[in-house]
Amino acid sequence: MINTQIIENLQILLHKEDTTLLEKLSFKENTFSEPLLIAYFNNKKLGTLSSEILTEIMQGFFIEKEPLKIKNSYNQNKIAYIPNIGYYNHNRELVEPILEIEDLEVIKELHPLLNRYLIEFYKGHITNPNPEYRSVWENHIATLKNALTLIKENIPDFFKEFHSANKKIFIHNNPRILNFTSIETLGMLYFYATPYATLMYFVEELIHQGSHNILYHITFDKKDFFKIDAPNTIMRDLTKQKWDYRDIYGAFHGVYTVYKRLECYDILLQKNALEGKDKHELLGRLADQFSRFHTGLELLNLDEVYTEKGKAFYVDLDKKCESIINKYVLLKREFDLSNRDLDFRYEDFCLLNSFEDFLIKDKQGFYNF
């Protein structure tokens, strides 16, 4: 799943930036899939960055260890995160070790290179470019672990894909910073988590956001898939749907991530992997995908937008989505999702969809598909 072209590009950039540094590095795969390495070169495009930052980021991957350098890595909490080593305070004391769960690293303190990616965003508009947030990993670590284990044990093929493209996760407390990934920090997952965050919340977002990172690898060479400049072509310019602020590439990501959620939810239901409130929420989240399917891409002239490879990929995704939706179509009438804004929230879903009524029907086999 790892796109070797990405690794090769990073090695070339490193060679141009600092040949001596490149010679110090272990050439293991995870060295060149470090999200902060990718973020460094993307941040550098915006202005001058000290090469010392690059050394600090990559010193945890040196073949031979050297004295620790952390001067440029301190964040607003005065903690320096050094990949593959740990977290240090201003006295250069190790205050937190690296934490991994099912090979996914949980970021406890964000590196300053990543700050600019966290913004408050609503329906195509940046509402706050410098929001406040804090890490809340400790409050949600058990639920995250359970979600990863559930996916690994029940959807092993997806878990392998997920693991290949997703390396680290940062969990914060600001729900106005919508969950996201970025090709500029490829391999990172950014989640908000409220006190109400459930098992299924993490399951959905691991599948949803994790699939964005998977698709970045698949479609890294966009010319293989698109005849047009997809990231810079706005949907409404082609579909005439005035509300649609998305670019073509972003909308394509939407179809892919809807399909991956539908596919994984179908597997979980067929395996009877969940029960009680977890199953209630799973079915609600599955029904929530219906309105996220066919939101505009189906209106495009496929032959003008896609290459043959891209068209075949899109048509296959579309057919698979439609097949799963048809399988569960009764859920469209079963659940009331009228109070959902952008994100599905189980506490809101329960206001309109009684858990007690669900239990009665579930015991009667109503939700056996």
Residue ranges and their predicted role:
Residues 207, 211:
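Short active-site segment of divalent metal-dependent hydrolases/proteases
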Residues 145-148, 163-192, 202-203:
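Active-site-proximal segments of catalytic enzyme domains
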Residues 131, 184, 255-260, 362:
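Extended, composition-driven regions rather than compact fold-specific motifs
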Residues 182, 196-205, 216-244:
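Post-HEXXH active-site segment of zinc metalloproteases
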